[in-house]
């Protein structure tokens, strides 16, 4: 399956939430009507079956983190093998993706932009270039911007946006040095309450 590169508003309207919130601070354009599903007539959403709710939640989270279907299923399988709650494990694996950590640290204004920075070798992990967006960051890892990439205007703009949001407990960032430390794996209470990971577990458990 190819990665979706179409209008972000369309996907967000499909899921009924802003999937691409810029650095957790700036929402999509006000013209993007979240109350109606995409389409010519913008029909309002009908009542979904249990399966429909489970599928929508899975699609919402998958698109939020920018993960393809096969990769998302593999994350679920890995989460199920780890000791603890499968749903929480799944979210923690997604949060540990390098592109997500770059986004959380404010170096990319969206996860998509953060993924580009990683792919273009603008990101260092413990002083070494890593260009794999799915790379799993570990507690204590230092993630920073490569020296020759520090003058990119989009990175500076992203850090300005990130300054508007609340500080995350599991990440420490030195904006001046364009460097941050992944202090610990976030607890479930640290993550969005708008995600119902139990629906995803129910879907894949069938």
From Swiss-Prot:
GO terms for molecular function: rRNA binding; structural constituent of ribosome. Part of the 30S ribosomal subunit. Contacts protein S5. The interaction surface between S4 and S5 is involved in control of translational fidelity. GO terms for cellular component: small ribosomal subunit. Residues 96-156 form the S4 RNA-binding domain. It comes from Hahella chejuensis (strain KCTC 2396). It comes from the Bacteria. PANTHER family: 30S 40S RIBOSOMAL PROTEIN, SMALL RIBOSOMAL SUBUNIT PROTEIN US4M. Pfam families: Ribosomal_S4, S4. This is Small ribosomal subunit protein uS4. Belongs to the universal ribosomal protein uS4 family. Transmembrane segments: none annotated. One of the primary rRNA binding proteins, it binds directly to 16S rRNA where it nucleates assembly of the body of the 30S subunit. GO terms for biological process: ribosomal small subunit biogenesis; translation. The gene is rpsD. Keywords: Ribonucleoprotein, Ribosomal protein, RNA-binding, rRNA-binding. The keyword Ribonucleoprotein applies.
């Amino acid at each position: 399956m190819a990665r979706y590169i179409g209008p972000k508003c369309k996907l967000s309207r499909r899921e009924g939430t802003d999937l691409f919130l810029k650095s957790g601070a700036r929402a999509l354009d006000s013209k993007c009507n979240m109350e109606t599903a995409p389409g010519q007539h913008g029909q309002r959403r009908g009542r979904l079956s249990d399966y429909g709710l489970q599928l929508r939640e899975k699609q919402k989270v998958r698109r939020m983190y920018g993960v393809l279907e096969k990769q998302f299923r593999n994350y679920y399988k890995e989460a199920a093998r780890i000791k603890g709650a499968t749903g929480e494990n799944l979210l923690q694996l997604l949060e540990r993706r390098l592109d997500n950590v770059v986004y959380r640290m404010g170096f990319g204004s969206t996860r998509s932009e953060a993924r580009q920075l990683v792919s273009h070798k603008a990101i260092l992990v413990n002083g070494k270039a890593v260009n794999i967006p799915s790379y799993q960051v570990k507690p204590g890892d230092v993630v920073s911007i490569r020296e020759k990439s520090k003058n990119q205007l989009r990175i500076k703009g992203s850090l300005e946006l990130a300054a508007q949001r609340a500080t995350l407990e599991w990440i420490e960032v030195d904006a001046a040095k364009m460097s941050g430390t992944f202090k610990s794996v976030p607890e479930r209470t640290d993550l969005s309450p708008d995600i119902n990971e139990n629906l995803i577990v129910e879907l894949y458990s069938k």
